[in-house]
Amino acid sequence: MTKASVVDQSAPAYAPKRLLAEARAASKVNIEQVFAFLEGSPEKAALTNELLAEFAADPAITQGPEYYDLTKAEQREQTVKKIARLALYLENDIKLARKQHHKDVVRDLQSPDAPMVTMSDMERFEKRSTLVALIDPQLATRLGVNLSLFGNAVRGNGTDEQIKYWLQERGLIFVKGIYGCFAMTELGHGSNVANLQTRATYDPASDSFVIQTPDLVATKWWIGGAAHSATHSTVYARLIVEGKDYGVKVFVVPLRNPKTMELLAGISIGDIGSKMGRDGIDNGWIQFNNVRIPREYMLSRFTKVIPGNPPKVEMEPLLDSISGYAALLSGRVSMVLDSYRFGARFSTIATRYAFGRQQFGDPTNETQLIEYPLHQFRVLPQLAIIYMMAPGAMKLMDTYNSCLGELYGAGDDKKKLTTVSARMKDLFVESASLKATCTWLTSTLIDELRQTCGGHGYSSYNGFGKAYNDWVVQCTWEGDNNVLCLTSGKSLLKKFAGIVRGKKVTICDTSMDYLRMDYIQKVVMGGTKKVSNLSTLPDYYQIWSVILVKYLKRCAETVRDNNDPESVSKLLVSIAKFHAFYSMLQEFHRKLASDQSHVGDAATKEVLWKVYKLSSLYFIDKFSGEFQQLKVMSPDQMTNVQEQMLAILPEIKTHAIRLTDAFHLPDAVINSSIGNYDGDIYHNYFNDVTRVAAKDKAPGVPPYADMLVNFLARGDQFDNLNISETSFKNLGK
């Protein structure tokens, strides 16, 4: 059975295509304006559309349902093939940026005399890489370990000469010549980077470092790219000079011969085996046994070892902290954007299914799932959350790029470096809060929306299973979410306590504008009570600043009384989440209320305001206990929140299909049988399943058919189990 079906296509219960078409026709939301709002501008939206279309048309990047049946070995091989394909896209994107279409630009840029590659050279491919994460997360990570983690470790810690040598002359940022991995995590330490145990001992006689794994727990672990592909690694190790430990620094250590991929002397590497997901990434372990590297392979922007008798170590303690921020910021910032894009993909699938699927009611015209109030409550707030994320994710990325530009442009100017250090510390707090909150939200979204698709959501071919297994590592790597929330919460509490004590506290980001003495006093004195009525649009984000101030006040008083910061750790996690909600809602409001919203149609803007309200109402309801405990809202006001939310759901329902269409995701990118644009969920699903199954040599006859036949036809073989008569009698006791 193919598209030509024996089922009567006029039967309403079997016409999901018509139901989706009717839903699109019922809404007048301008999806192009919404897309521009989500992406930041019409120009950025056009580029996103162009790159998605390129990927959708490229079978080397996007795959059909067969993608979900690949073995681990096949995933590894397919991922390498895709990286090779992306390397060609990268070269072409640089040619477009430089308008040099018929030259070997990469070869020219690898020359020692070539100018430094600029951010504008890489801008198109940077955007492309964020979209790769939407299509194939393991591909994005395996390439990102090389370009982002290794690359940013060098950029953040290396001198200008080292940056140019490793990234440009050796070809790492072109995915050519060498391939990098990022060896920070150890078997015994993850989040506690300061206590990593791998050693880099300086040997004055040979002017080199000896890299050593002192014991089993110091084995580098979970290192993406290590098992099969990396030729070099940025290794985080303790700098030891003349017996003194100077803390963890970063070293470039060769692992393999790039021409043969054979391991170098003293390097032991293995695969860490199967994981929950992302098996296309060759995560491995690394041990070093007296591996020597030249002194120049230590990344020396902020810490230098000067040869001599005795050798000297020059450090900039304040600026050295930048290296810790720079290496991990890229991944955390990217994960916030990934949360938006990945969530958009699965919101689209579940929303389309909710309109096309019918169950119960009139047997001749069953009720669409989306018409049930409970289903609206399960699906539509998740869509609103993704909309809430978008402006905040774009702002965070812009702030990160701005900070990075300042950092790279500062050179050795200590004054400029000190200034950018303050910005990066605030960015570290902001990115930690948003990374944790958004990855948690998207993790919950994928599983909740899988359940809204019933049994069909459990099929691999509809995407949810692999997506969840691939996604949830985002809640752990590059900063465990709870640890990140504690770090962010502690920083916010420290700023709050300093302001209350009258100290001068530097605030670089508008998301922390509630940390002002006048506003704190206003909240404490009850001057913000009107906000709790949610009578104006700004109230929906400002309510979160009110609860943040009250929460911080409670934490500060508790720590003051018991002198135990750990006693408020649970509250600090909530503070970090609430700060993320405030930051995202504030930016959504600022963007939509500004002249730069790119939403000129009044009706479309009104729908977006409803989405904004729903996202805030949903979380107020979710954390109703905290709002009432801290007396931010009364029980009557909380009842009003719930009534508002239930009233707004059917209003958003009318526009939900067009709101998902506004993500501009091609079917090849969504890769879900029940999530296609046409809404033909049953035919698409059946055809995908039968097409994949057609590869079986004898459909319907399993390769273990003889085993089935034999045990079904067996005689009385009870005695073959070797169960004694005594044991048999005891079975009933």
UniProtKB/Swiss-Prot annotation:
The gene is POX1. Its cofactor is FAD. It catalyses: a 2,3-saturated acyl-CoA + O2 = a (2E)-enoyl-CoA + H2O2. This is Acyl-coenzyme A oxidase. Its EC number is 1.3.3.6. It is found in: Peroxisome. The lineage of its organism: Eukaryota, Fungi, Dikarya, Ascomycota, Saccharomycotina. One of its GO terms (molecular function) is FAD binding. Keywords: FAD, Fatty acid metabolism, Flavoprotein, Lipid metabolism, Oxidoreductase, Peroxisome. GO terms for cellular component: peroxisomal matrix; peroxisome. Belongs to the acyl-CoA oxidase family.
